Amino acid sequence: MCVGKKIKSYLESNGITQTFVANRTGIPVQKLNLSLNGNRRLDFDEYELICGALSVGTDKFLEPKIPEQKGV
């Protein structure tokens, strides 16, 4: 699942509106909506703003990248 959709799911689970996030971050609602629906990539700066508005760490919606083990 992409980061935007994870954020959208988090918002829905916690009763937080996209308008609230847009107002707290300064990201236009239309732009935010496109990102949360997977139709636009989030910039890292926007991602940081969203995490700050939600009071969560920037690792909240990211999947850990597991390095490939060579020779195993």
Question: What are the language-model segments listed below?
Answer:
Residues 1-17:
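A short, Lys/Arg-rich alpha-helix, primarily the initiator
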Residues 27-41:
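Recognition helix of helix-turn-helix/homeodomain-like DNA-binding domains
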Residues 9, 15, 34, 52, ...:
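Short, charged recognition helix plus adjacent turn
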